[in-house]
Amino acid sequence: MSILEIDGSIGEGGGQILRYALALSALTLKPIRVYNIRAKRDNPGLRPQHLTAVEVLKEVTGAEVENAKVGSMEILFKPTSRRSGEMEIDIGTAGSISLVLQAMLPVLLFAEGDSRARLKGGTNVPWSPPIDYIKHVFLYNISHMGVRANIEVVRRGHYPRGGGLVNVEVKRVEEALKPLMIVRRGRIRGFRIHSHCVKLPAHVAVRQCESARRILSGIFKEKITEEIETYPPDKDPHLGPGSGILIYVEAEPGIRLGSDSLGEKGKPAERVGEEAALILIEELETGMAFDRHMGDMLIPYLFLAKGTSRIGVSMITLHLLTAIEVGKLFFPEAKVEVDGELGKPGIITIQGVGYKP
């Protein structure tokens, strides 16, 4: 099989290209050479968390790999099979568990059987969706396509110390994924706020939550459900310190849109809650079915689905357009239409390939 050449500097030119390329290579068993890896970043080349994704997928697929080292600008990845089973994955310090999961999930869905993985690393870290978003928003939305996966957060890990622990269960998909046809959201059913802090006074999580609630309740009349997660000092198993908030809205016809914000040193807890609430309001004002982060995460699955998917996203991002470009490289037969401008709401139509191993 000829090697698929992928320029890692296309689109947003970051780690996302590598993650999606690895995921689709492992899934289709098409060998790839990715060059110019993270060429547009200040510290180009493979970083430790990208290396973990490579190592994990090497293990799952029995791949032959060349140049897999920190700082490498080019990598060769030749997968041979898709295994399932139990895995232990240590990403190291606060490397993002969510981003490694992004690379793993498509492969595990089409593996030989069901899979279980135990991942150590960062659950709530900068420049990455929090594990709460993956659990409550992403997995919920793609369940409409036939994906069955579950996440258990055993322990949180924040930057820079990490130490998070997450258990993941993935059910094998027996048939091709179903297409997704949801352009606009319907009536709002309610809001849910998840606010947490570790190795910090409990009032931090409470203040984050109250700030978000105050803003949302001033605009919306729908029910707001709160979940505040704190730990007494003598029973806090985390390395910490850290805090964060996820807010998501349940809307018809059975979708979720989310937003989040991370605490950091010197940032008032009230601002953490306020940031997440204001972002979610922006998402909802567009009337589209999916938030800006969900948009690019959905793209690989829309390429795999059997039939035509049509989704509305609150913002067409460079990440979304990059995900489409990577998808086209693996599935040139798929038809794609983007209706909208960069930075604006838009509609994505993809005629999927009905992928089955």
UniProtKB/Swiss-Prot annotation:
The keyword Cytoplasm appears for this protein: yes
Annotated positions binding ATP: 102, 293-296
Ligase is among the record's keywords: yes
CDD domains: RNA_Cyclase_Class_II (cd00874)
Main location: cytoplasm
Active site: 319
GO biological process: RNA processing
GO cellular component: cytoplasm
Reactions accelerated catalytically: a 3'-end 3'-phospho-ribonucleotide-RNA + ATP = a 3'-end 2',3'-cyclophospho-ribonucleotide-RNA + AMP + diphosphate
Gene Ontology terms for molecular function: ATP binding; RNA-3'-phosphate cyclase activity
Keywords carried by this UniProt record: ATP-binding, Cytoplasm, Ligase, Nucleotide-binding
Record EC number: 6.5.1.4
Function description: Catalyzes the conversion of 3'-phosphate to a 2',3'-cyclic phosphodiester at the end of RNA. The mechanism of action of the enzyme occurs in 3 steps: (A) adenylation of the enzyme by ATP; (B) transfer of adenylate to an RNA-N3'P to produce RNA-N3'PP5'A; (C) and attack of the adjacent 2'-hydroxyl on the 3'-phosphorus in the diester linkage to produce the cyclic end product. The biological role of this enzyme is unknown but it is likely to function in some aspects of cellular RNA processing.
HAMAP family the UniProt entry points to: RTC (MF_00200)
Family indicated by similarity: Belongs to the RNA 3'-terminal cyclase family. Type 1 subfamily.
Record-linked PANTHER family: RNA 3' TERMINAL PHOSPHATE CYCLASE, RNA 3'-TERMINAL PHOSPHATE CYCLASE
Record's protein name: RNA 3'-terminal phosphate cyclase
Organism: Desulfurococcus amylolyticus (strain DSM 18924 / JCM 16383 / VKM B-2413 / 1221n)
Gene: rtcA
